[in-house]
Amino acid sequence: MHNGVMKAWLESSHLAGANATYVEDLYELYLSDPDLVSEEWKRVFDGLPAHPTNVVEQPHSRVRDYFRRLAQETKHYNVQVSDPEVDAKQVKVLQLINAYRFRGHEAAKLDPLGLWNRPEVAELNPSFHNLTQEDMEETFNVGSFAIGKDTMKLKDIYQSLQKIYCGSVGAEYMHITDTEQKRWIQQRLEPVVGTPVFSKEEKRTFLEELTAAEGLERYLGAKFPGAKRFSLEGGDALVPMTKEMIRHAGASGMREVVIGMAHRGRLNMLVNVLGKKPQDLFDEFAGKHGEGWGTGDVKYHQGFSADFATPGGDVHLALAFNPSHLEIVNPVVMGSVRARQDRLGDEDCSKVLPITIHGDSAIAGQGVVAETFNMSQARGFCVGGTVRIVVNNQVGFTTSNPRDTRSTMYCTDIAKMVQAPIFHVNSDDPEAVAFVTRLALDYRNEFKRDVVIDLVCYRRHGHNEADEPNATQPLMYQKIKKHPTPRKLYADVLTERGECDLETATQLVNEYRDALDHGEVVVKEWRPMAMHSVDWSPYLGHDWHIPWNSEYAMERLQDLGRRVCQYPESHVLHSRVEKIYQDRLSMISGEKMLDWGMAETLAYATLLDDGKRIRISGQDSGRGTFFHRHAVLHNQNDASTYIPLSQIHAGQGPFEVFDSVLSEEAVLAFEYGYATAEPSGLTLWEAQFGDFANGAQVVIDQFISSGEQKWGRLCGLTMLLPHGYEGQGPEHSSARLERYLQLCAEQNMQVVVPSTPAQVYHMIRRQVVRPMRRPLVVMSPKSLLRHPLCVSSMEDLAHGTFQPAIGEIDALNPSQVKRVVFCSGKVYYDLLEQRRANEQQDVAIVRIEQLYPFPLEEVQAAIANYTNVVDYVWCQEEPQNQGAWYSSQHNFRAAIPAGADLKYAGRPASASPAVGYMSVHMKQQKALIEDALTLA
């Protein structure tokens, strides 16, 4: 109860962070004359800690202004305080200024169609603050109002506030608790007074870019009527906005820009921003495509790369490939950017800029958006802020009523969870759009935080060009039909100002249409790529059978083992962790056999020794969910951390392990993006339990399993999914192996179930050393991490290799074997122990360690000597409708002799992955083991 009262008090208190600016202005009045503030505020300020009598408190704004003037001019100014005779209404003036900062956006002219019916905001009226018409001619101190003056008449203050906060830009930033950030925005927003200044050349550029945006859509509509293109029309300003963002980024020193967006306006961006040849796009509309391999994807999912000339040099652009699943590309872009920043050593995030482009319904509706915002400042996922642009066309397919699409005032309110400033802007005002674009990027670069631009526009056609929007939005589309295009409106504005003429505007239209007819690049800033940002050439054209060197010199391996077991003497470990590290030293010396954790650590150490980068993330990945990894050592005295794998030697590759935010979808998407931009190293995502990975099913289905076939995108991401039936119930038993196997085709990925420490060692090394990059899905163990039989020798690591299938290990007489049991994973040890207990000699057990691509030759070799076999059995712990049985039995049948019988031993089909009662689990487990080992 106490916590609830305290929370309520803080939220309503004047000490709440959102009121900081207002309180500071009141305090400055109090310093000039305590009687100018109310008795309540006077008591608050009187109660502040007193300064020594020889110290005089000065208003903060005066001090800031003083030093600002010193920096700009040679002569000095004395600090002066306000006139003590200022009228008490001064407080009301400051309240009015604050009201506009907080709520002016609610009265801004944001909707190009003028259809928004928003209630009046009483606080924006001077009369609400008891300011009369007579007061309008009075002069008041403006406080922190960054208008360039200390005092102004109230009428001038009021008019300025209207222009700044209620024009084409609606600024939301007072929810930010950091006063420095709010002051920074005010000092750049308020002096402009709603009228940004641009040169004649810049204005012509904006008109040219609006002409291009409109011209392409009209050209496509005429040339390919009825074809889906998800037109940008109505949101044309996105093209000049994005190009201005890139130009400003280049001038700021950026070297790369990575863009993620959905289908709306994508074709326009490809042609008019990234420089895709119009003829190539026309060929796609006509059904032509290259003779490459792969199934391909629709044109509005395609990515693209190019270089773009800016005042600061060429900037490399990359538009990410993406599916129609809205918003999922955003964490992919962040992962790609993080990889590029790591590769460039861009520690201050000043060289690579992420831009994500959203829809208004999607940013409010898709849960991955909140996950992505939550990652934005987390250590393992921060990219120094993302510029997030919302193409707010006020309708999602057929739904336009905000009460149906969200529960908030704006679609962008979700961004307030990370205190991102939000700039709403009317897309029919391209100069306001350009101003907000620069302001947003400058904020991102200054504070390295996310910033949102809400580009309020409309959709001239239906969801696609074959759709009829009047059926569901009749009033909106009656208005749109009569509404001039953004190009026409801006051309008229420039003509009225005398900065352009009708002939010039028409000439731009004709020149752009002629350029489209020629089919060549229409972006004047386009440059051929000097070099690929990410070099994939070493990994192209290789199949699964390319040889790789699994050997590692024993002496070097032992040396690495000793190094990764060292930590400073002053670093006090938990007793259990200390025992694990002592045991690992014994494993290196040969006194003990290697367990899973040590073999895994040695695999990482060898890759780091070769200069490869390793990145591991997941919930609890530093320690490991099951207390086996301990890559991060925590000092029990001061909570400091030490990572032995980062301290092997000076020339090693970088090693990073992050305990991720508690998200599967956004984090896995981030790691996919990272792996697609960092092919040379190891990128590994680990689920806390494999059961929870289906929270990221969109990433698995749309990117990991199919990205190569759809888009030709290689990816070497590794997924560790703890899997195994140990009586822990339906939520902690199954990584849903069957779903990954169902997705396997066309050699698209690997599904592996390693059963020994040596296997996991070679599996990890193979993923990096072998010059082929495809996803690796691993059913990793839980109880096997400490199983007494699940051990390997140093010899197995140094001179062994990964075995896709492992034959019988006991000395059985092949002629006596009547049954061969195939299996994968933990169940092997249950079968082995029970067979030994039974002293059976007639059943051989073969482990299939790699279920896809299926190792047909290796399995056939493992059973070749068993010529008297009566039947073959596939044994699994999972229910019959799950696991590998349904998805892989055709492979098992192909491996055994023609006409041989293949039986199933496992749990019966079940709607749930596992039972919830330990007693039932044990009964089922015993039955399936007996079934597998008992001959008919």
Set out the residue ranges of the language-model regions.
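Subset of Sec-pathway N-terminal targeting signals
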Residues: 2, 7-48
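Thiamine diphosphate
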Residues: 2-7, 16, 46, 119, ...
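Extended, charge-enriched "interface" segments that sit outside catalytic cores
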Residues: 48-238, 254
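Conserved phosphate/anionic-ligand binding catalytic regions in large, soluble enzymes, centered on
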Residues: 95-112, 244-273, 358-377, 448, ...
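Glycine/aspartate-rich loop-and-adjacent alpha/beta segment that forms the canonical ThDP
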Residues: 100-103, 107-160, 168, 277, ...
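Active-site cores of enzymes that catalyze phosphoryl transfer or operate on phosphate-rich substrates
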Residues: 194-216, 283-345, 644, 771-837
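Cofactor-binding active-site loop characterized by glycine-rich and histidine/acidic residues
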Residues: 255-419, 423, 626-678
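Hard-cation-handling environments
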Residues: 486-487, 497, 501-614
